[in-house]
A protein has these predicted regions:
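Short intrinsically disordered, low-complexity coil segments enriched in acidic
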Residues: 1-3, 94
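Short phosphate-binding/catalytic loops that engage adenosine nucleotides
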Residues: 110-112, 190
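Short, flexible loop segments at the rims of nucleotide/cofactor-binding pockets, characterized by
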Residues: 90-95, 119, 188-189
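Conserved phosphate-coupling serine/threonine residues in phosphotransfer and NTP-handling enzymes
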Residues: 27, 118-120
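Asp-based, Mg2+/Mn2+-dependent phosphohydrolase catalytic module
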Residues: 3-18, 105, 121-220
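N-terminal helical cap/lid subdomain that shapes the substrate entry/recognition surface
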Residues: 15-110, 126
Length: 220
């Protein structure tokens, strides 16, 4: 179990946890800035009137992005966007957020269960596995967009992760970076640790129990 000392007045003082649930981009890998470049280009091409859309869609599945923003006349462009996205992801740099490998290894040594809960699909994950063959050894469960019907900020993905691990929601702590992801963890009734890899500490603080820059020096 994790036992968090008091780091924020909103947290339970000495609550123990049995599982840690991690988002992928901006939480495990420092990749959100790369996606901002890709989706910024696509949004300016097709939806120039929606300023900053590339930031608002973070945490959403590709299906949800298409349904909400690329429908009607833009539906015919989905195939081309998808092809460009997969080509982009195949060339992406997947660098771990500083301290992540040591942190999650420590959790597992303590007997905690760990799960990846990402809006990315299985094809994206195949690119991750090719670049990081060790990746699957970090997690007891990996949930992708194919495993849940509602995307973040819905709590559905985290409900399913807790169920997969045979744990109660309150036994889990969530690590997230995007506004949609943070809201998802909060709506699931879980303790939420926010990483300021994508948004500022000040902006994400209202949605978190703890805010950290990365995993370096984050002791349990």
């Amino acid at each position: 179990m994790i036992n968090f000392a008091a780091r924020n007045r909103k947290m339970d003082m000495e609550k123990s946890y049995k599982a840690a649930l991690f988002d992928l981009d901006g939480v495990v890998f420092d990749t959100e800035s790369q996606y901002s470049i890709f989706w910024g280009s696509e949004c300016r091409r097709y939806l120039p009137e929606e300023d900053g859309l590339e930031h608002k869609i973070k945490g959403q599945t590709l299906v949800q992005i298409y349904e909400k923003h690329f429908s009607g006349e833009l539906e015919k462009e989905r195939e081309n966007i998808t092809k460009r996205l997969y080509k982009f992801e195949a060339q992406m740099s997947f660098e771990y957020v500083p301290g992540f490998e040591q942190f999650i290894s420590s959790l597992r040594q303590q007997g905690l269960k760990t799960a990846l809960v990402t809006s990315s699909n299985k094809m994206k994950m195949e690119a991750v596995y090719r670049k990081h063959p060790e990746f699957t050894t970090f997690f007891d469960a990996i949930l992708t967009s194919e495993d849940f019907s509602e995307s973040k900020p819905s709590p559905d993905c985290y409900f399913r992760a807790a169920e997969r691990l045979s744990l109660d929601n309150g036994d889990c702590v969530v690590f997230e970076d995007s506004f949609n992801g943070l809201r998802s963890g909060r709506a699931a009734g879980m303790t939420v640790v926010g990483l300021s890899t994508t948004n500022s500490k000040e902006d994400i603080a209202p949605l978190c129990d703890i805010v950290i820059n990365d995993y370096i020096g984050f002791n349990i």
